[in-house]
């Protein structure tokens, strides 16, 4: 049985007049007066569907073929022939069609041929990958993931899996999910009973506080200080109640860490990474991107093509603040030296002032994490954010503080104890080395390359406050 995919056939990898077997789902069925049915078949291998010609001589034509509706799964044996239509150059004449799965009640099937809003599709996240848009997003996500792995491997980086359950707060924030088993059985027995918050972890699984990770960075640093170049690519969690199109409670991060690298080194690495993976995306997923041009954003191809060639602007945080203070714009969030940049500030700089990606360096230490290297002015840290038009911040990074005395000072300033970070301090006690790294928010990258406006539509099953239905 010569099983092939739709993309194999449409790309010309299978010769005409070849008998093949193809499996997939029905997108649409059209019947002609000549007792011929035209079936559009998709299997997820590409954005396009394949036309299947079903003649009435098929043994199950009347009883089954004429009952096929959108979503039915089938396995088809047929011959590839030249198409007489203009939509595609080949089609398949069916010799046998076996129905694997019916739609129980087509009138209640949530995914019909008509156009659905993205809001509606979120309510049926388990079925939305059957739509062209979400299918395209999934393939783009896969291609970007592979491109990131390949780029970093070629640069000599080693992939390291870091813990999802952790005892450390990487960012020094309170927006963490606690992991506890102390009341698990009670909740399982009575799901409607509220959890009684307690700080007593004596009888808990780990006998101490545990959290879902907000970053794999600290663990990656440990391996970078032995293997030189490492990266982590995995899920991270933030207990943020922000109900915006830019925030998720669960999202994916790419976090390279490299020994002997400075802030300037990782800026070069980050810019090169972004340009490389977008160039590969244009090469490998042109059909999916062209589809999104028609459905989502007509300018997305131009934006991506320009991205690979455009020069990133570099400015100091202090300079960025001056630009924001003197611009003729009234912001909702007042800005002055020492405050962090909000989304409106980031978008003004990248979309209106520079009209291109911009890298902001050397932020005040009071608005950045404890692990960032203190600059000689004792006011700022060796940090950087990369802003892109339409998104704002897409990458954040820094040179890490390799000096134990300075690290202890920063821990104290952030009301963090040396005891909780004992192993992280050990990295400075035993053969410390300058090292740097950054974090790339994968879903924000997905928003940029697809033109989709809501971050909940570029991840398979979005997790947000009061939303965990799947």
UniProtKB/Swiss-Prot annotation:
Q: What is this protein called?
A: Asparagine--tRNA ligase
Q: Kindly name one Pfam family recorded for this protein.
A: tRNA_anti-codon
Task: Output the GO biological process annotations, alphabetical, semicolon-separated.
Answer: asparaginyl-tRNA aminoacylation
Location in the cell: Cytoplasm
Q: Which SUPFAM superfamilies match?
A: Class II aaRS and biotin synthetases, Nucleic acid-binding proteins
| EC id | 6.1.1.22
Keywords (alphabetical) are: Aminoacyl-tRNA synthetase, ATP-binding, Cytoplasm, Ligase, Nucleotide-binding, Protein biosynthesis
Q: Which PROSITE patterns match?
A: AA_TRNA_LIGASE_II (PS50862)
- Supply the gene name: asnS
Under the subunit heading, UniProt states: Homodimer.
State the species of origin.
Blochmanniella pennsylvanica (strain BPEN)
GO MF assignments? asparagine-tRNA ligase activity; ATP binding; nucleic acid binding
């Amino acid at each position: 049985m010569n099983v092939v995919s739709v993309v194999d056939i449409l790309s010309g990898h299978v010769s005409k007049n070849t008998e093949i077997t193809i499996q997939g789902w029905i997108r649409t069925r059209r019947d002609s007066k000549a007792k011929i049915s035209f079936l559009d078949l998709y299997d997820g291998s590409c954005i396009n569907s394949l036309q299947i010609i079903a003649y009435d001589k098929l043994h199950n034509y009347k009883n089954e073929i004429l009952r096929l509706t959108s979503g039915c799964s089938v396995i088809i044996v047929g011959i590839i022939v030249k198409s007489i239509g203009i939509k595609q150059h080949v089609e398949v004449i069916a010799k046998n069609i076996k129905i694997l799965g019916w739609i129980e009640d087509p009138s209640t099937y949530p995914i019909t041929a008509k156009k659905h809003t993205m809001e509606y599709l979120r309510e049926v996240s388990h079925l939305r990958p059957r739509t062209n848009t979400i299918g395209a997003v999934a393939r783009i996500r896969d291609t970007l993931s592979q491109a990131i792995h390949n780029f970093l491997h070629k640069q000599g980086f080693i992939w390291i899996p870091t813990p999802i359950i952790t005892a450390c707060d990487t960012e020094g924030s309170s927006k963490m999910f606690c992991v506890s088993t102390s009341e698990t059985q009670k909740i399982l027995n009575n799901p409607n009973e509220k959890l009684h918050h307690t700080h007593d972890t004596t009888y808990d699984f780990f006998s101490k506080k545990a959290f879902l990770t907000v970053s794999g960075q600290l663990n990656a640093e440990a391996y970078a200080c032995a293997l030189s170049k490492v990266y982590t690519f995995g899920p991270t969690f933030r207990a943020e109640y922000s109900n915006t199109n830019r925030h998720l409670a669960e999202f994916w991060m790419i976090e390279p860490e490299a020994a002997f690298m400075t802030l300037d080194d990782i800026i070069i690495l980050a810019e090169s990474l972004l340009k490389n993976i977008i160039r590969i995306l244009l090469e490998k997923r042109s059909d999916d991107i062209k589809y999104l041009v028609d459905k989502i954003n007509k300018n997305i191809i131009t934006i991506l093509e320009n991205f690979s060639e455009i020069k990133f602007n570099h400015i100091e945080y202090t300079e960025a603040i001056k630009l924001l203070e003197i611009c003729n714009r009234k912001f909702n969030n007042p800005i002055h030296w020492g405050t962090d940049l909000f989304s409106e500030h980031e978008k003004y700089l990248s979309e209106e002032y520079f009209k291109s990606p911009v890298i902001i360096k050397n932020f005040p230490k009071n608005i950045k994490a404890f692990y960032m290297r203190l600059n000689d002015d004792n006011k700022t840290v060796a940090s950087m954010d990369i802003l892109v038009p339409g998104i704002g911040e897409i990458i954040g990074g820094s040179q890490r503080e390799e000096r134990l005395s300075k690290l202890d000072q920063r821990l104290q300033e952030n009301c963090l104890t040396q005891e909780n970070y004992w192993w992280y301090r050990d990295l400075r006690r035993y053969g410390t080395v300058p090292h740097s790294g950054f974090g790339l928010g994968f879903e924000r990258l997905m928003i940029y390359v697809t033109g989709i406006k809501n971050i909940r539509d570029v991840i398979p099953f979005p997790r947000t406050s009061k939303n965990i239905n799947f």
